[in-house]
Every structure is written in C-alpha cells, then in structure tokens.
From Swiss-Prot:
The modification Phosphoserine is found at S282, S294, S364, S367, S452, S476, S578. This is Actin-binding LIM protein 2. Residues 22-81, 81-141, 151-210, 210-270 form the LIM zinc-binding domain. PROSITE patterns: HP, LIM_DOMAIN_1, LIM_DOMAIN_2. Residues 279-295, 363-372 have a biased composition (Low complexity). It is found in: Cytoplasm. Gene3D superfamilies: Cysteine Rich Protein, Villin headpiece domain.
Amino acid sequence: MSAVSQPQAAPSPLEKSPSTAILCNTCGNVCKGEVLRVQDKYFHIKCFVCKACGCDLAEGGFFVRQGEYICTLDYQRLYGTRCFSCDQFIEGEVVSALGKTYHPDCFVCAVCRLPFPPGDRVTFNGKECMCQKCSLPVSVGSSAHLSQGLRSCGGCGTEIKNGQALVALDKHWHLGCFKCKSCGKLLNAEYISKDGLPYCEADYHAKFGIRCDSCEKYITGRVLEAGEKHYHPSCALCVRCGQMFAEGEEMYLQGSSIWHPACRQAARTEDRNKETRTSSESIISVPASSTSGSPSRVIYAKLGGEILDYRDLAALPKSKAIYDIDRPDMISYSPYISHSAGDRQSYGEGDQDDRSYKQCRTSSPSSTGSVSLGRYTPTSRSPQHYSRPGSESGRSTPSLSVLSDSKPPPSTYQQAPRHFHVPDTGVKDNIYRKPPIYRQHAARRSDGEDGSLDQDNRKKSSWLMLKGDADTRTNSPDLDTQSLSHSSGTDRDPLQRMAGDSFHSRFPYSKSDPLPGHGKNGLDQRNANLAPCGADPDASWGMREYKIYPYDSLIVTNRIRVKLPKDVDRTRLERHLSPEEFQEVFGMSIEEFDRLALWKRNDLKKKALLF
C-alpha cells in the first residue's frame, strides 16, 4: 500500500494502440497524460478520492480496507482503535492489557505514574495496574508468604515468571488462568466469588442466585426478605399506598401481597364498612319479597352479561375493574297489582341471548286463601308464575286464576301476592332484555305432601307453581280445567328437571299448566334451566354444569377487559377447564383445589392467569 504524492507523467507507451492502453481502476476509461499508480493499479488524479468523504487522496495519506481507499480521518472514525487512557486514536505501536488498548506512553503504573518497562511484571488488583515495586506493599503477611504468593498462580499453581499477573481473591493469577469455575470463560471484567472460587455472573445466578418474587429477575446487592419471599428493595411496594419499605420496617404478608401494617389495618376497616352498605354504582338490591314480612334482602350485580350475588362480588379482587354495572335506579319495580288478561298476554319477542339470573324468594305468611296476580319486571320475557304456600294453617291452596273476556275487578294492592308475573313493560322499562333462568333447590319433599301427579300433565306444564296439598289443589273450585289444556299448534318443550323427583320443603315448587293464550306470547321455554339458587357457588360444582373451554381461550393476560366466551363465569374461570387440563395447570385435582383457602385459590388462579 502506497500513496503517490506527486503526479507522474505518462510514459510514451500510454499513447500506443488501444489494445495496450492502461485503464483507470475507478472510472474504467483510458489513462492519458498524468496518472497515479497505487501498487499495480492506475488512477486518474481526479478519480483517486476517499470512498467515505470524497476528498482528494493524491496529496495525503490513506488506508486500504477491503479494496476501498479511505482517508486517515474517516478510517479512524470508522475503524480506528482508541486508547483506554487518553481516548485518542492509536497509530503505530499498541499495548494491550486485560482486553484494553493503550498508547505505550499512556500505559503507566497507577501509583508511581511511570511507564512499564518492556518485559516487566504488571500486577492488576481488580481496579488498577501497578508495577512490581509498587505492588509489594499491598500484600499483608510475611515476606515468605508474599514471595510464595507472587511466584505461584492461583489457577494452575505454576510459578508466575516475568509478565503480567492479576491479583484477585487474595491470590495472583496468570491472565489466562483467571476463569469461571463453571463454564471456563475468561474473566477480564466483573466476577462473583463463592467459597473462594470465581464465577461469571450468569453461572453464579444459575447455581446460587435468588430471584425477586416481583420482577422475577436475579437479585444482586441488597435483598429484602419477607417470609419465604425475596424482593429487590425497589420492587417491594405496599399494595395500598405503593410506597417502598424502609430498612427494618415491619411488613404484613398476605398471599402474594405485602402491606404496611397501618395500610392493612385501614383496608380492613374499609372492608368492614363496605359490608354494611351498598354502592349505587356497582350493586343493586333486589327484594326477596315485597311484603312487609319479608325476612331478607338479596344483593345482586350485573357484570359483563352475568348476574352476580354478594358472594361472587366479595370474591372479586379489588384490582379487577367491574364493567357494565347497572344502576339500581334504572331497574323498574311495580307493585303487585292484578291486571287484565290483555296486560298479561301482550309480550313482544325481541333479539335476546341466554343469560342466567339468580332469583330467590321467601314465602310470606298470609291469613287468606285468595290469590291475586302481581307484576315484577326483571325482564321482558319468560313470564314465570311463582306461588307461595299458605299461612299458619298451611291449608290455603294457591291456584291459577281463570282468565276470561269479562272485565276483571279493579286493581287493588294485595298483602301477600303469590304469583309473580312479567307485564307488558316494553323496551324502556327493561334494561336487561335477557331471559331469566329460574333455579330451585333439589332436596327432600316434606313428609306431609302427596307426591302423586299425573306424568302427562308434568310434561305439558311450563309454569312454576309452589306446590301445596295435591288433593286440595285438584279439588279446588277456583281451578278451571279448561285452562289446563294446551293450545293447538303450540310447540313447547317441558322444563328440564333436576335429578330426583323430590324438592326441599322450604321451596316446594311444582308445575302448573299454562294460562290461556300462552302460545300467543311468542315465549320459548326450551332454555329454562333448574339449578340451585342462593347456594354457595363453590359447593355447586357438581350441580351446575360448566361448559368446557380450552385453557388458551380462558387466559386473562392484562387488566383491561378481555374477550372471553359469553357463557363463562368470569369469577371462576378454572371451572371451565377439563379435569385433565385442570390437573396440568394447577398440579392438583379439582377436589384438592376446593379444599384450599380462598386466598390460596385466588393466588393460584393469578399465577395461572385465570383471575
């Protein structure tokens, strides 16, 4: 590689025939007149320029890299080597030590600031390089021990002769002997020692490292312990106030959450206050009975198309947002008033999807045997009739009133309504617009009841009625036998029955025949479902049927609303897993999972992304 500083005159052979002409290596044209020669190549003066900046290279130095000609400034900028000490580019002789490069004059002892003589021993103590004279006072101990330490390598055990040496772990090492004990990687920068042996950072963490339970990264330096959990000091944050924990400060650990003691106490106080009041934005109160003798109130909330009771709401985590909560002042309630046949028969059929709605009602005592129809508007569809048992005597038999074309008596308030009926409320009074699914307890029938009912009438019936005394109901003069027949041309399927023919005496529901004109309502009872009402959702594992979905379609990956199948229970996504997939995800059977505490189940569900 050479640079031609002065243009050379073209010799006479350049003006020979084209077959012997000399071509420019850059432009490919014939060289005439003054040309430059670089090694065995020829260039026009104007064609010999820097590949990077285009400056003229005829008068200055240049470098050749992969057949390209580059000026000095651009070559140093692109490919040059800097001195570790002065940060200037190195040209000419280079000194390399511990993976770093220096000018010969810049590689000096850190103590006496003198350059190292050629062939002299260099000692590196982990931070600085020292000459042989300055490194002697560093070691502590007898001169014999010092001499032995200087002569033998801590890695190979052989004598360290003239040359560079490295001081680490109170030993001297050949530069090529200071390696990771596990992978054998040469350690020329940071390392971590364990039992007097050096390890690279990756192998040390793989063998002895501790992971942070919050960020799941390895912890180096200070570590905060809470029980069996470990955290970076910056990762251990109170779930309530979001502040870090000071050194020596007490911590309250619950599941995977950590609290300041004061924050935990404040949260408990808030939880107790929340149990005694209902939020107008998140829950609605549905009366168990509208009579003055109603013994209880049942609290529901509408979440993502599902109706949740108070147990389900209490199981929801505080960090999970609740969507689609219907305001209680938007739900229409009407007094229990008897209405004409036209009001009871005018129902419109709209586009509705199947959504379950838990309904529980308690019986109300009454001293009269008369029955009147009332109105209750949770939906605009599926007008189910509920009848309640009699009063103290237990012999008052509720029955379906006979509907006729004659004008009914004036509307009056009744103290003990026993039939619940959906009136013609239209779209404006109904914000749910979903067909309810009525559920009932499956248990024993009371001893005093007669269980004989005609099997054919059971299959035809599509209305739920509180079962009274069978003989009294059959002989009741208020029951019109003509109204028990099915209208011709009406296609209805019977309600699905729970396993077993007996029901709990507290909820002695039975079936009665439909009212006249039932086929005109456009109602479809085929989706009616009988399931336990008000029972513990966990206890109803074997009673309620959960549709099986693959694990991938049930995963909740973040805190925003996730698109899940419509018919899944968002509070119990794990119930929609098959037993085999449940065992694979949680490492236990369903029965073992149900026996765990609630906080433990929620913690496992969070780790499985099903919470």
